Every structure is written in structure tokens, then in C-alpha cells.
A protein has these predicted regions:
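Generic detector of bulky aromatic hydrophobic side chains
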Residues: 11, 24-29, 60-68
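Short, basic/aromatic recognition patches
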Residues: 2-27
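Zn2+-dependent cytidine deaminase-like catalytic core
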Residues: 3-6, 41-92
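Short beta-strand scaffold segments in enzyme catalytic cores
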Residues: 28-42
Length: 92
């Protein structure tokens, strides 16, 4: 059966959907952290927790946005899950 996605293709599709959750108006980025072909965390770029979802762009960069990778790593830390040795799949 040749139509089955390999693991990299599979995670690439999932991280693309994750990026669609981004609240950033300039760029939507998603990140998956994967260990042993299992997703241990995911994140997307967006506004700082507790801040108004208002886009403030200076020098072509959003001013109050947390990176997708930061969100995925922080999620692991909050749940006490080690991300050491994980593979990051990032859309951008």
C-alpha cells in the first residue's frame, strides 16, 4: 500500500492545521513536539496570555506574540513532560 503517509508527511499535515489556530495577523506558525512518533505537545504563535488580541506590528514584527515553539515547550513544562530529545515540526 503506497498511499499511506510516512511519519514526516503525517506530522507535516497536522502541524499545518495547528498553525491555523494562530491569532497573529502577519504570520500563522504551528509547532509539534514529537517523541517516538507520538505528539507530546503542540503550539501556535499568538498573543500573550491575558493580553487583548490586538495586532501591533512594528518593523514588520508583531509586538505581543509568543512563538509557536515557545508555546509548545511551555506546554510541556506546565504538564511536567520532558521535551528533551523530541523532534520539532514547525511550519515556518
Amino acid at each position: 500500500m503506497t498511499d499511506r503517509l510516512n511519519w514526516d508527511e503525517y506530522f507535516a499535515k497536522i502541524v499545518s492545521v495547528t498553525a491555523e489556530r494562530s491569532s497573529c495577523h502577519r504570520l500563522h506558525v504551528g509547532c509539534l513536539l514529537v517523541k517516538n512518533n507520538r505528539i507530546i505537545s503542540q503550539g501556535y504563535n499568538g498573543h500573550l496570555p491575558g493580553c487583548k488580541h490586538e495586532s501591533i506590528i512594528r518593523n514588520n514584527h508583531e509586538q505581543a506574540t509568543v512563538h509557536a515553539e515557545q508555546n509548545a515547550i511551555c506546554d510541556c513544562a506546565k504538564r511536567g513532560v520532558s521535551c528533551e530529545g523530541a523532534t520539532a515540526y514547525v511550519t515556518h
